[in-house]
Amino acid sequence: MGEGYDLVVVGAGPGGSSTAYYASRAGLKTLLLDRQEFPRDKPCGDGLMPHAAGEVAMMGLGDWLEEPHHGRFTGISIRTATASIRQGVPPTLHGPRGYVIRREETDAKLLERAESAGAEFRSRTRATKLLRSPAGAVAGLLAENGGGPEGFTAPLVVVADGVGGFEGGMKAHQNAVARRQYFRGVGGSDKGDIHIFMTEDMNSSGAGYGWVFYLGDGRANVGAGISTRSLAKTGRNLKDFYDRFLEEPEMAEWLRDAEPEGPAKSWSLKMGMWGARRHEQGVMTVGDAASLIHPISGEGVGYAIESGRLAASWAHEAHRRKDFSAATLSGYASQLLRQRGREHLSGHALVNLMPNMELLEPLFRACAKDGGASRALVESFTGDAPVYSLLKHPRVFARALKDVVGNLQRA
């Protein structure tokens, strides 16, 4: 049996590195494992919304965010078939802006911070099985590193392996897919914004949208995502959905002089936190493994870092109590639910409306004419406000309802 630890973390993405960073700072002897060598490419939209940038800054990386080759955005534009909304991003302690940074770089930097805090990192090491005591309590895990199996003892394991499906993870439904490619020389109306597109073709497909996020080095991340349920109903595949987005008239114009860099890459997402367990005796899950991707924006980095920070705090508390029971670790899941539950639940409500754009388009049009409502809508996309904050603008719903009734009467 290998060396003993206070905590073993499976997966060195944002959630795992955050857990290892905060746990090490709290004095826990922490081992961080990942199947891959870092840095490594990670398909993603690459956007760091303001709340995510705040979490990154809390890990001591505020100056790194400001490096000149990083993309910055101070506005968000949403285009639907009949409406156009543009708002500045919500201000944070780090400033009224978000960032666009390749995940390859972000993840490597977060891992560097975890190691600088004292965490031990082992790459090319795949966790395979939880170890348990004769009484059934978690006692560590087994891993493969190319040289045969190796065991690591620890009373606590945090699973942060995304959709990897490690045995200790809580199974969650992968309910969305996305695809992105990098292009150099992308046009566009305002490169200080991130751009969200909900085109007529996408509306007919259901809950999906496209995006253009500008990096700071002349490239842009151009992608599209859709719920697996909506995609299945169309009979199309993700590549076709993405290619048709690139052929939209506005996108075709933006890409007219652009050159692709590298292949398009796809990935699966566990969006929305409802229905997933995040703890059991001796185990907590964080980030994508805990289904914490925002149900509207698809952003997961900020929630992963936040959940890692909370999990590390509860790992420290469990060691203080010398109690690693499910009852103790339920404090982590409860705290996460209190902080993000209503936001995710209301986000699901909006996503469930997306396949019925006859209802949603009038709402977007009404929001476009009301500054407060349009800000609330944009902030719901970024995860900086719950969708139900729109209820503070009843006149918008009245206008939208009038529009819907008028459309029905004309039909």
Task: Name these PLM-found stretches.
Residues 8, 24-44:
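Glycine-rich FAD pyrophosphate-binding loop
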Residues 113-255:
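Predominantly flavin-linked oxidoreductase catalytic cores and closely associated redox partners
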Residues 15, 38, 164:
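Conserved Rossmann-like nucleotide-cofactor binding loop
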Residues 53-108:
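A conserved beta-strand/loop capping segment in the N-terminal third of enzymes
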Residues 316-411:
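C-terminal helical "tail/cap" subdomain of flavin- and related membrane-associated enzymes
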Residues 1-15:
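Beta1/beta-strand and adjacent pyrophosphate-binding region of the FAD-binding site
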Residues 37-57, 61:
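Conserved N-terminal glycine-rich FAD pyrophosphate-binding loop of Rossmann-like flavoproteins
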